């Protein structure tokens, strides 16, 4: 899958009024045949869609200094070598809203099938996220 960030806007004065709006464009390449619930894709097919994403603070979760997390001496073995690093993250109670839009008829059909089958909660979904990692993923 290929992803391109078309638009990214983040505004905040504090974590209680943080607002993120993003538009990401995706190209999904099918590497095999797939069929489910009336939807069919063949090997080599491509679907193109846009993801519109909004993130804001969850009004039911207050942000406190304790939400800034650090972990020292986190050891990991990579290729037999032990690596130690300090980790920092922000535990953020987020309210996430998103929508998908296909860029052509076949892509729109696949998006509709996905939403009907798997992802019907697209507005005001609440989740605790690692804000650093999530922003890094969106921006990359």
Curated annotation (Swiss-Prot):
Domain of life: Bacteria
Family under the similarity heading: Belongs to the MG439/MG440 family.
Protein's name in the database: Uncharacterized protein MPN_148
Originating species: Mycoplasma pneumoniae (strain ATCC 29342 / M129 / Subtype 1) (Mycoplasmoides pneumoniae)
Lineage: Bacteria, Bacillati, Mycoplasmatota, Mycoplasmoidales, Mycoplasmoidaceae
């Amino acid at each position: 899958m290929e992803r391109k960030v078309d638009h990214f806007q983040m505004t905040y004065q504090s974590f209680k009024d943080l607002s993120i709006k993003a538009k990401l464009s995706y190209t999904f390449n099918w590497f095999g045949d797939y069929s489910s619930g009336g939807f069919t894709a063949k090997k080599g097919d491509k679907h193109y869609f846009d993801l519109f994403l909004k993130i804001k603070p969850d009004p039911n979760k207050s942000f406190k200094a304790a939400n800034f997390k650090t972990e020292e001496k986190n050891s990991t073995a990579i290729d037999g070598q032990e690596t130690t690093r300090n980790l920092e993250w922000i535990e953020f109670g987020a309210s996430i809203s998103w929508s998908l839009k296909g860029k052509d008829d076949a892509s729109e059909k696949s998006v509709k099938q996905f939403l009907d089958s798997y992802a019907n909660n697209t507005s005001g979904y609440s989740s605790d996220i690692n804000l650093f990692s999530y922003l890094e993923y969106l921006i990359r």
